Each structure stands twice: as C-alpha cells, then as structure tokens.
C-alpha cells in the first residue's frame, strides 16, 4: 500500500513538472532583465516583457478592485434603493385582485357547531373530592 501511494505521488509530481515546463506562464520565472536606473528604460522593458510573454499588444483589461466604494465617492455612502424591485417582483396577471376567502372546515370533534345540543366546555377536569 505504501509503495502504491509513493508511486502515485511520483507520477503526480511528474505531471505537475511537465505542465509547469510547457505552460505559457513558465517563462515568468525566466527573466533576463538587467536592473536599469532610468525610469523610461524600466517602463520600456516592462512593455517589451508584457508583449513577449502573452503575445498581447494593446490595452490590457483592468483587474478587479476591492477598494470600498466610499473611498471612490469622496467618503459618502452609496444610496441603496429600498423596497421590491418592480422589474423582477411584479404581481403576476393570473392572480386574483381580491384577497382569498377562507372557508372554515367543520371537524367531528367540534360538537358545538355541528349539533344543536348543549355545548361542552373546554377546560381543566373537575377536581375530585378524594382528600
């Protein structure tokens, strides 16, 4: 069992190493840049590196920002609409416009409504005089 687990670990490491060596992102670790003091040269070398890595020339999409919205709006709170969204929560046309009428069900245990005899009072049982 231990030899089988060792074999699985070796094969998985081999697959990961193979995937890392053939992926496009593998050349991120292979940088041949020489440190440059001039800021124009640094910007130029960064542009060249970005174009070489992905083959992408032009405007790069902006990454998502996780800054709070209050920082962008001058520290004022965002207005949030209250109440239901009428576009998604409209009243369907097939529902009746009047409230439903509920009919009270008659039960066999309710003798006060089904019979005309004396009604049975509901309450605690009478105390016995056994003291």
Swiss-Prot record:
Chain positions carrying an annotated carbohydrate: 84
Superkingdom per UniProt: Eukaryota
Modified sites of kind Hydroxyproline: 81, 84
GO molecular function: receptor serine/threonine kinase binding
GO BP field: cell-cell signaling involved in cell fate commitment
Annotated Gene Ontology cellular component terms: apoplast
Keywords carried by this UniProt record: Developmental protein, Differentiation, Glycoprotein, Hydroxylation, Secreted, Signal
Leader sequence residues: 1-26
Disulfide bonds: none
Annotated family: Belongs to the CLV3/ESR signal peptide family.
Protein name per its UniProtKB record: CLAVATA3/ESR (CLE)-related protein ESR1
Organism of origin: Zea mays (Maize)
């Amino acid at each position: 069992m231990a030899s089988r687990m060792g074999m699985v670990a070796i094969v998985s490491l081999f697959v990961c190493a193979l995937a890392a060596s053939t992926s496009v992102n593998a050349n991120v670790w292979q940088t041949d840049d020489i440190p440059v003091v001039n800021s124009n040269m640094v910007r130029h070398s960064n542009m060249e590196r970005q174009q070489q890595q992905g083959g992408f020339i032009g405007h790069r999409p902006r990454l998502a920002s996780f800054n709070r919205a209050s920082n962008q709006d001058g520290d004022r709170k965002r207005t949030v609409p209250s109440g239901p969204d009428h576009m998604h929560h409209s009243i369907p046309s097939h529902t009746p416009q009047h409230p439903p009428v509920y009919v009270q069900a008659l039960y066999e245990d309710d003798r006060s409504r089904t019979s005309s005899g004396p009604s049975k009072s509901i309450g605690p049982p009478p105390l016995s005089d056994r003291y």
